[in-house]
């Protein structure tokens, strides 16, 4: 833990093409090894694929993120030698981060031939409440529901 207090939250500039801060964050999450131009090609390529079927791709991405974002998650809490999975509510910034991470991970596991197509297919599925990312959210919610008895261990 840092002794100097928490670092201030850095702001993310909106992306140049759509002017959306959410899309800019999404691009940063897709990025690997600092290759932002590659990440931009992937995200914008996916949005072009979505644009063929749905005229407003930014809204569809937002809807997909809202559908995937978890309301609760479980955190491990050690009490007297036993470790309990305690359900806790997820704060909004973490909700979006988890939603993006799960969408990207699910897209990478898909069978389509290019990453933009994989990401577009996963976003379309998530906007219609199906796909791997939605399955991950349901699994997280199920875990929280199963461990509801330990909710009083919240900190």
Curated annotation (Swiss-Prot):
- CC annotations in GO: cytosolic small ribosomal subunit; ribosome
What GO MF terms are annotated? mRNA binding; rRNA binding; structural constituent of ribosome; tRNA binding
What GO biological process terms does the UniProt entry carry, in alphabetical order?
Answer: ribosomal small subunit assembly; translation
Establish whether keyword Iron-sulfur is in the entry: no
- In terms of superkingdom, the source organism counts as Bacteria
Sorted alphabetically, the keyword list is: Ribonucleoprotein, Ribosomal protein, RNA-binding, rRNA-binding, tRNA-binding
Entry keyword RNA-binding: yes
Family statement: Belongs to the universal ribosomal protein uS7 family.
Summarize the subunit comment. Answer: Part of the 30S ribosomal subunit. Contacts proteins S9 and S11.
**Job description of the protein:** One of the primary rRNA binding proteins, it binds directly to 16S rRNA where it nucleates assembly of the head domain of the 30S subunit. Is located at the subunit interface close to the decoding center, probably blocks exit of the E-site tRNA.
UniProt-listed NCBIfam families: rpsG_bact
Name of the protein in question: Small ribosomal subunit protein uS7
**Species the sequence originates in:** Xanthomonas campestris pv. campestris (strain ATCC 33913 / DSM 3586 / NCPPB 528 / LMG 568 / P 25)
């Amino acid at each position: 833990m840092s002794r100097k207090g928490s670092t201030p939250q850095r702001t993310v500039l909106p992306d140049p093409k759509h002017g959306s801060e959410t899309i800019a964050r999404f691009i940063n999450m897709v990025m690997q090894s600092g290759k932002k131009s590659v990440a931009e090609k992937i995200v914008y390529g996916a949005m072009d694929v979505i644009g063929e079927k749905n005229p407003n791709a930014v809204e569809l991405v937002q809807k997909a993120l809202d559908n995937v974002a978890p309301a609760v998650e479980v955190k491990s809490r050690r009490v007297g030698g036993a470790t309990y999975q305690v359900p806790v509510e997820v704060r909004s910034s973490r909700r979006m981060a988890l939603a993006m991470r799960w969408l990207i991970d699910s897209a990478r596991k898909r069978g389509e031939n290019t990453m933009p197509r994989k990401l577009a297919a996963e976003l379309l599925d998530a906007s219609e409440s199906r796909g791997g990312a939605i399955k991950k959210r349901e699994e997280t919610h199920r875990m929280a529901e199963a461990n509801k008895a330990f909710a009083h261990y919240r900190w």
